Swiss-Prot record:
The gene is coaE. ATP binds at residues 12-17. Belongs to the CoaE family. It catalyses: 3'-dephospho-CoA + ATP = ADP + CoA + H(+). The keyword tRNA processing does not apply. It comes from the Bacteria. It comes from Campylobacter jejuni (strain RM1221). Keywords: ATP-binding, Coenzyme A biosynthesis, Cytoplasm, Kinase, Nucleotide-binding, Transferase. This is Dephospho-CoA kinase. Residues 4-201 form the DPCK domain. GO terms for biological process: coenzyme A biosynthetic process. CDD domains: DPCK. One of its GO terms (molecular function) is dephospho-CoA kinase activity.
Amino acid sequence: MKNAFFVTASIACGKSTFIEIANSLGFKSISADKIAHKILDENALELEKIFSPFNLKNLLTKEKKIDRKILGEIVFNNKEAKKTLENFTHPKIRAKILEQMQILDKENKAFFVEIPLFFESGAYENLGKVIVIYTPKELSLKRIMQRDKLSLEAAKVRLDSQIDIEEKLKKADFIIKNTNSYVDFRQECVKVIQEISKGKM
């Protein structure tokens, strides 16, 4: 799709912040995470049954929604559980993303699709150009620990579950560095967005 620009990175690199900046400049976006969260909640009871072999306690909240923290703990430490979740959710997420992309592409204006596992999934390649947000591994670990209140070991497990950021950079059409202040990062984002929008407005 000529108007689609995918946004990906490692964990805690600033993908969502980029999307917020793009939205503030008048560009529309799609978030794989938001779609995934909705799918988890809509299928909470079914997922509880699917994950019953893993003996998870309190997978559902009192509101009968998925407790994503509990789910994350098992998924990032159990390859079988991770595969089970991906087999259930990924086709649904992809279908919803493609549906929304087709709608936005008709507007003939650049839009952004935030997909954390863009390269890992291999499900969206050749559908648009790719923006990779770069943060050094050490800084990503620090941010994960602060944001998610995790130990260093737990943060490493989550970061190592994805393709190394250096490998992602090799496949990027655009690279945005997020290594300093928010002001610097925003300037980098705006610069790339303006470059993209020149031929899309």
